[in-house]
Every structure is written in structure tokens, then in C-alpha cells.
Amino acid sequence: MNDNLKPADIVREEKAQLDFSRAMSYGDYLHLDAILGAQQPLSPAHDEMLFIIQHQTSELWMKLMLHELRAAIANVAQDELGSAFKKLARVSKIMEQLVHAWDVLATMTPPEYSAIRPYLASSSGFQSAQYRCIEFALGNKNAAMLKPHAHRPDLLALVTAAFEAPSLYDEALRLLARRGLSVPASHTERDWTQGYVENDAVESAWLTVYRDPKQYWDLYQLGEELTDLEDAFRLWRFRHVTTVERVIGFKRGTGGTGGVSYLRKMLDVVLFPEIWKLRTDL
């Protein structure tokens, strides 16, 4: 090994491909021209670039999250739990990534945000179609949340499909019923567009699983994957609240909500209630 090699010598020695006139390059594969050209600040403020990239990268992570969630829901519906577990674990890690992403936006100070806020008009993360699909896939159904997408038939179709489909938890309960556990028909054959209502019989079914993990190991693991997922989702929401409060205080959000007050209320939403309640009753 020659420790005196210069960088140019290393590239030559490794025979790295340098000519892409007739081959697909890294930028070609990733369509980087389109991605890196998508940041179009409207204000003269230096910090608007941070604001745009924060939200664009979050949307990319949410695209992957939806890709994994939809596949995981299909896996659970088909009793393919091994495949579902891998995807749900990945979703939890994506949420962890998004939690840390708030640390970057938190470097924006109130005066810096105030300089760009007038240029945002009524645009808001509240209107994110992908985030709404994630909430619907996790069971937080609310018909009013379709309205922000009514002006875009393509987006309306996307969120409506998620709204009308069984959620991850719906499919988990149907799986428990297929395995012979006593889950009421009111929770396995219901109107999927309605919000989930906590049920004692559902908790009893989960308690059966948690009292005998050895017999119901894969269902027990499913319960813990759901717990991990909601735990990660809560942290993501909480970090959103604290970042918004740090940057804008209690001003109303650009989307018309109360801002921090709205986000704090959303922290109280429980997605998989029986899995949390059984920990007290076990």
C-alpha cells in the first residue's frame, strides 16, 4: 500500500468511471435537476431556503412512510406478519428521523420566521395531503380533513382512498378475529370512514395475547410494533409543537388553525387505545 498517493492517483488507481456522456449518472438516476430546482423562495430572506427544504424533505420521508404503511397494512390483511413487522419498524425509524429534523428548523428565530411569514399566505403543513393519508392509515379519520384538497381532484382522490380504506389498526383487529380471538363484529366489519371507538372486548382480546405471549407470539409482536409506531408518532407530534411554539409562539397558524393550541390538542389523540390501556389492566 502506497501511503503517498495523491487523491488524483487514488481515483486513477481505483479505475473510477468518470465519463457519463453515454451512461446514467447519479444525478440522472435521482432526477436531481428537478429536486434541486424545486426550491423557489418568494422572499429575499436568507432563511426561507431552510424553511422550504425542511418541508420538502419531510414530504419525501412521508412519501416513503406511506409506501411502507400501505404495504404493511396489506401484509397484515394477508397474514404476512413477518413482512409487516419489517415495514412497521422502518416507519418508526422514519418518524424518528423526522423528530430530529425539527432540530434544524428550530435554529430559525422568531424574527427570521417573521420575515418570511407574509410570503406564505395561507399555505400550511395542515394542508399536506401525504400527512393526512398517514393519519387516515393510522386510524385518525375525520371527513372535514378532505375539504382542504377539494380544489385538486387528484389529491382529493388520494386522501379519499385513504379515508375509505381500513386502517392499520382495523386490519390488526380483523387479524385477531381470524385467529379466533373474540373481537366484536362492530370492530371488524364497520364503516371505515368513522373514527375508531374504544371497546372493552377489543381490550380483552389483546389482554389474551399479552397474558400468553408464547402462544400468541406473532400477535404479541404486532401489538408491540403498533406501540412502537404510536410512540414514535407522538414524539414527532410533540417535537412539532415545541418547535412551532419556539419559532412563532401562540400566533395563529397560516392555515387558519390556532397553531400551537391546535397541535397540543392533537397530542391527546390515541390511535391504538386498547394496546395502551391493557398495560394498566394486565
From Swiss-Prot:
Give me any GO biological process, just one.
L-tryptophan catabolic process to kynurenine
Keywords associated with the record: Dioxygenase, Heme, Iron, Metal-binding, Oxidoreductase, Tryptophan catabolism
Is the keyword Iron assigned to this protein?
yes
Q: Which reaction does it catalyse?
A: L-tryptophan + O2 = N-formyl-L-kynurenine
Cofactors per UniProt?
A: heme
* EC code: 1.13.11.11
Provide the top EC class. Answer: oxidoreductase
Sites where the protein binds substrate: F51, I52, I53, Q54, H55, Y113, R117, T254
Its pathway, per UniProt, is: Amino-acid degradation; L-tryptophan degradation via kynurenine pathway; L-kynurenine from L-tryptophan: step 1/2
GO MF, one example? heme binding
UniProt xrefs under InterPro entries: Trp/Indoleamine_2_3_dOase-like, Trp_2-3-dOase_bac, Trp_2_3_dOase
Reply yes or no: does the keyword Iron apply.
Answer: yes
Cofactor-binding details, from the entry? Binds 1 heme group per subunit.
Coiled-coil region(s) at which residues? none
Binding site residues for heme: H240
**What HAMAP family does its record include?**
T23O
What the protein does?
Heme-dependent dioxygenase that catalyzes the oxidative cleavage of the L-tryptophan (L-Trp) pyrrole ring and converts L-tryptophan to N-formyl-L-kynurenine. Catalyzes the oxidative cleavage of the indole moiety.
Similarity remark: Belongs to the tryptophan 2,3-dioxygenase family.
The annotated subunit structure for this chain is: Homotetramer.
Question: By what name is this protein known?
Answer: Tryptophan 2,3-dioxygenase
Q: Which organism is it from?
A: Polaromonas naphthalenivorans (strain CJ2)
